[in-house]
Structure formats: structure tokens, C-alpha cells
């Protein structure tokens, strides 16, 4: 189950991300397995829009809250556009690497440039890498 907490009903980022996640799980039922396995807290802060959300993944499903709530296992900070681009990242074509980004994809190259320049920052790595990869897998529009 993917839920927008009442605290986040007026949060555009929360609604956008929840809509993408719901649509992706509906279009790709195999992602439901990945979603059920997610555990932890993921905070996303779109600095230019001054809006933040916290995803809580537990046995009940996924809930998106307004703001940064609790201590996140992983935090993504950056502009609204690079954060939105995370749903457009291209997966590797090889079956063994299908859950990982394709370094040759134009969106992935743009994301890499944003990471190198500091326009996009990810805190909580390497421990949070499984959460990041699984979240990316569920959110990827393909």
C-alpha cells in the first residue's frame, strides 16, 4: 500500500512521487515485490522549491510524510529537476545488472554530472545503497 500521510496532502513533491510510485507498481506488478522488501526512511529535500518529504517503508507498505521526519537512513538533497530525473534513469540492459543504472544513458549521465557538481547530494551511503537502488527500481518510469 502506498499512502500519502494527511500531513503531506498539500505537499506537491509528496503527491508527485506517490503518484509515480502507484502508477509504476500498477504498470509493473513485479515491482510490488521490491516495494514489499523496502525497509527504512528516505528523506528527499528539493532545495530550490524548499520542500521536503520522508518516505517510510515498513511491513505496512510505503507512507510519504511532509518534511523530514525522524532520522532518515538515506537523504537525497538537490534541485527539483534532478530529483524528478531520478524516475527517468535508464537501467542496464544486461539481465544481471537490470536493477542498476546504465552509465551510458543520457539521463544517468546528467545525474552523474549533478552529483559531481554538488547539485545533487546523497547522504547515508554506502549503508543506504540497498534502499537507494530498490527505491530507484520502484520509481523508475519505463
Where do the model's predicted regions map?
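Feature captures hydrophobic
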Residues: 1-142
